[in-house]
Amino acid sequence: MPKQKTHRASAKRFKRTGSGGLKRFRAFTSHRFHGKTKKQRRHLRKADLVSSGDFKRIKAMVTGL
């Protein structure tokens, strides 16, 4: 059976944390900030962890993580 290839787009978007989680950055941060409040923009700057439901799927796509 051939080796499973790493999904390159996913490998660039997720990083492993020290405790074993997956770090991701938030969506809606590239443009159209005039429609968002200052609080929304501030919260969008922070990274977040991948939810437990998505963790298994992403881990399978990115074999090196």
UniProtKB/Swiss-Prot annotation:
Record carries keyword Ribonucleoprotein: yes
Biased-composition ranges for Basic residues?
1-16
Q: Which InterPro entries match?
A: Ribosomal_bL35 (IPR001706), Ribosomal_bL35-like (IPR021137), Ribosomal_bL35_CS (IPR018265), Ribosomal_bL35_sf (IPR037229)
> What keywords appear on the UniProt entry?
Ribonucleoprotein, Ribosomal protein
Cystine pairings recorded for this chain:
none
Map out region (Disordered) in residue numbers. 1-21
UniProt-listed SUPFAM superfamilies: L35p-like
Which is an annotated GO molecular function term of this record?
Answer: structural constituent of ribosome
Entry keyword annotation includes Ribosomal protein: yes
Concerning PROSITE patterns, the annotation shows: RIBOSOMAL_L35
One GO cellular component term, please give it. Answer: cytosolic large ribosomal subunit
What GO terms in the biological process aspect are recorded for it? Answer: translation
User: This protein's superkingdom?
Assistant: Bacteria
Q: Which family does it belong to?
A: Belongs to the bacterial ribosomal protein bL35 family.
The protein, known as? Large ribosomal subunit protein bL35
Read off the lineage from the record.
Answer: Bacteria, Bacillati, Bacillota, Bacilli, Lactobacillales
